[in-house]
Amino acid sequence: AEFIVFRLMGYLAIACTYVIALSLVVGLIASLLGPGDQIIRLSDLPVWLGIGFATTLVLAAYGSIFNAMGLISPKYGVYLCIVFGIWEFMMGSFSIVNPNWTVASVSISHWALQMIDAMVLLAWPDTIQWAEMDNAFGIDSGLSVFWQPPVHTLGTASAGVALLNSVLVLLMVSVAWIFIAKSVFSRREIM
């Protein structure tokens, strides 16, 4: 298992450093360019850091899945990964349209989008009010298309609970696929 974990950690060290740095740069640019009472809107930075953190967890989950698929079938693993990628794209699209669909909750992209929706609600608590104003007055701002309140709150309607659920699910997916890869790898010889 150490070989698989070290391989994944090396990949994450490079990819996640880039993603977090990119999210900070984009967050800083967005906070400078967006309208606000101050020169820099610091309330934007938690959202962009949340996007970076969600992307980091998604990279860990996808990395462990693709690593395991490559170990399960060295010859056809790449084709399995392509099919899985198409599945994830479809489920991500379904999650944007309606996050309440049960079929979408079996995808990694759904949980990442739920995590980002929860971060938006934690950073900007009036987002629900703005979405309701859009619906009430028929304003087509696009908010209702790209943002939905998080649905996995265990009945509490709390964005913090939804964020915690999303983090735990993404971590459990990563750990489960690492153990699957470990069990496959333990039966093979290193050439």
Functional labels for PLM-detected ranges:
Residues 68, 168-191:
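Junction motif at the cytosolic side of a transmembrane helix
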Residues 77, 81-175, 179:
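Terminal transmembrane helical anchor/hairpin motif
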Residues 18, 22-30, 92-95, 177, ...:
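Structural signal for membrane-spanning alpha-helices in multi-pass inner-membrane proteins
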Residues 13-15, 22, 89-92, 189:
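A short hydrophobic/aromatic micro-motif that marks alpha-helical segments and, especially, helix-coil
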Residues 4-74:
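Secretory targeting signals
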Residues 38-44, 157, 187-190:
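C-terminal or late-domain output modules
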